[in-house]
Regions:
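Conserved alpha-helical substructure of the radical SAM core
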Residues: 1-76, 162, 169, 176, ...
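Residue-level preference for short coil/turn positions at secondary-structure junctions
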Residues: 14-15, 44, 117, 227, ...
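Short, flexible loop/turn elements at secondary-structure junctions
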Residues: 25, 52-54, 82-84, 125-127, ...
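Residue-level signal for well-ordered alpha-helical positions
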Residues: 63, 92-95, 271
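Flexible mid-to-C-terminal extensions adjoining Fe-S/redox cofactors in radical SAM and related proteins
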Residues: 225-230, 243-342
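Exposed alpha-helical structural elements
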Residues: 5, 59, 88, 172-175, ...
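Radical SAM enzyme [4Fe-4S]-AdoMet core and its adjacent flexible, acidic
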Residues: 1, 70-233, 241-243, 247, ...
Length: 342
């Protein structure tokens, strides 16, 4: 989509807080800072997250600086994809030298963050058959040697071209999540020391949220268990592709193209096509391991926010667990028979 098309789109959208820009590689778009400024000004967006493979270091650094300079109230999160050490990462990403280039990008972004508190820097690791044996060591390596704000660990989702990448056993995934949760707790505590806005209550909800989301992902991956909340894809979030195709979830097929609606978002939002797809999600009882839609559905669920998360937090407090304790004691993650569905 051109900048003019995006300007028309922005002008027809309501105010919203979160904008997540993915790819492809988002930082290959030279006018990315202008795109973000559109939504910052017109729609009052104040939280932007951008994943990157870390390859276009110079352009990434330039754009990040420009975003922070032109959008002074924006919280900008950059998630650098690292799927293993050295050759493992390069092999998974099919790009020789990707790991070293990504490390260079991380170092440059760390330098920017020392003078820009609105920038947060995360690592994102996708768990696959190829890297399952070094994911835990990778997490500890970044914790000990880099000044990061967080590290995400996500089981591979969707239908990859190489289906063997999904061959991670439930036992292996549980062990990885057991090691990942204390790392998440470490970064949450670290953020709370750096940012006064992350008070005790919010910190508690963040920690409970990590436990709950891992439990939900694992149960869905291992047993096909439904979420404890309805999926709100297409109601509280929407996916817009580079070519203006629009879908309620990136794992579902497009339901139209914004150009057919004259780039008028409100026209699309009130359309029969969107309402029909939302109804279809409900009929399909659509549940998956996709953390973006899981997280959005969590925070719009009264049951989760008022019951499930406090329950997880209280369990943590009652058992007297520290941030170093593993996943198996803070959640319901214990092996159980595969559930049959009728």
């Amino acid at each position: 989509m051109s900048l003019d098309e995006l300007s028309k789109l922005s002008s027809t959208m309501p105010q919203f807080h979160d904008l997540w820009i993915s790819g492809g590689e988002p930082f290959l778009r030279k006018d990315l800072a202008d795109v973000i400024q559109l939504f910052y000004v017109h729609n009052h967006v104040r939280d932007v997250r951008i994943p990157t493979n870390g390859l276009p270091t110079e352009q990434t650094v330039r754009i990040v600086r420009e975003i922070l300079e032109t959008c002074s109230e924006l919280q900008l999160e950059i998630d650098v994809s690292i799927d293993g050490f050295g050759q493992t990462h390069d092999r998974i990403r099919a790009a020789q030298g990707n790991f070293e280039k990504a490390m260079e990008t991380i170092a440059q972004l760390e330098n920017i963050r020392t003078v820009s508190p609105n920038l947060t820097l995360y690592i994102n690791t996708v768990i696959t058959q190829e890297n399952k044996n070094e994911v835990t060591k990778l997490g500890e390596h970044f914790k000990q040697n880099y000044d990061l704000d967080g590290h995400y660990f996500q089981i591979i989702r969707g239908d990859p071209k190489d289906t063997s990448l999904q061959a991670v056993s439930t036992k292996e995934l549980m062990q990885i999540y057991q090691a990942a949760l204390p790392l998440n707790f470490h970064y949450t505590s670290k953020l709370s020391r750096k940012h006064s806005r992350l008070d005790g209550l919010r910190r508690a909800f963040w920690k409970a949220g990590y436990s709950f989301s891992y439990d939900t992902q694992f149960s869905n991956y291992a047993y096909g268990t439904k979420w404890k909340m309805p999926c709100t894809a297409g109601q509280t979030s929407i996916v817009i592709d580079y070519n203006a195709d629009i879908r309620v979830c990136e794992l579902r097929k497009p339901i139209g193209n914004l150009r057919h609606y004259g780039m008028d978002f409100n026209h699309f939002w009130t359309s029969f096509e969107r309402r029909r797809e939302v109804d279809q999600v409900k009929l399909d009882k659509c549940f998956c391991t996709h953390i973006c839609f899981m997280y959005d559905s969590m925070r719009h669920s009264k049951r989760v926010m008022l019951w499930e998360l406090p329950k997880v937090y209280l369990k943590h407090k009652i058992l007297g667990l520290s941030d170093k304790d593993g996943f198996n004691r803070t959640s319901a993650l214990t092996p159980r028979p595969i559930e049959t569905k009728t």
